[in-house]
Swiss-Prot record:
Gene3D superfamilies noted in UniProt: 1.10.520.10, Peroxidase, domain 2
Catalytic residues as annotated in Swiss-Prot or TrEMBL: 42
Gene this protein is translated from: APX1
Name of the protein described by the UniProt record: L-ascorbate peroxidase 1, cytosolic
UniProt GO cellular component terms: chloroplast; chloroplast stroma; cytosol; extracellular region; Golgi apparatus; plant-type cell wall; plasma membrane; plasmodesma
Amino acid sequence: MTKNYPTVSEDYKKAVEKCRRKLRGLIAEKNCAPIMVRLAWHSAGTFDCQSRTGGPFGTMRFDAEQAHGANSGIHIALRLLDPIREQFPTISFADFHQLAGVVAVEVTGGPDIPFHPGREDKPQPPPEGRLPDATKGCDHLRDVFAKQMGLSDKDIVALSGAHTLGRCHKDRSGFEGAWTSNPLIFDNSYFKELLSGEKEGLLQLVSDKALLDDPVFRPLVEKYAADEDAFFADYAEAHMKLSELGFADA
């Protein structure tokens, strides 16, 4: 989709770049990249392309959205970000939360993701129930990512690769464990682990294993496991698309 990005002031651009530097320091110091990616994703992943509601527009600042079942633990990310947020009151929450996700991928060795500022904060959160359910398979993934958000099959598989970061916590998601042996490094090991089968101590969700059973998804899993550069290129594109759902559409 063609984008028509809003014009932002030079002062705003400078604030964003200074904020980016502060975020790099925080995320590296606190080892909190995974939860920053989760914050950005869960903010953006509520977008519905039919009603044009939800999306990456700062509504995670509301207690009501933080209270959604899928967002358990998100308040930890927001609390970590508060000291930086206070330094940049002119930056929208929408831009701030998406920038944190972009920087988190970069700091952990992942691809550089283009970031375009200018998102406006929406006044109310979306309804609960729009984020993907880890206990469901390919049809559900396509319902959420393709029909609801408007993303492609390639985007679905590339974005799944961000599970290379972080781990599940029983008290937040009902699941426990990391997908890879080094959950603070962004690389293609998620796909390698997926193809090698289940291992003691590592996690594979129903929604992960479903990628292997689909005739479109599986070749992409195999491609990304064999070629990290290809994964990085497709991930950067998919992450940018996710972070801009409903934003600057021409």
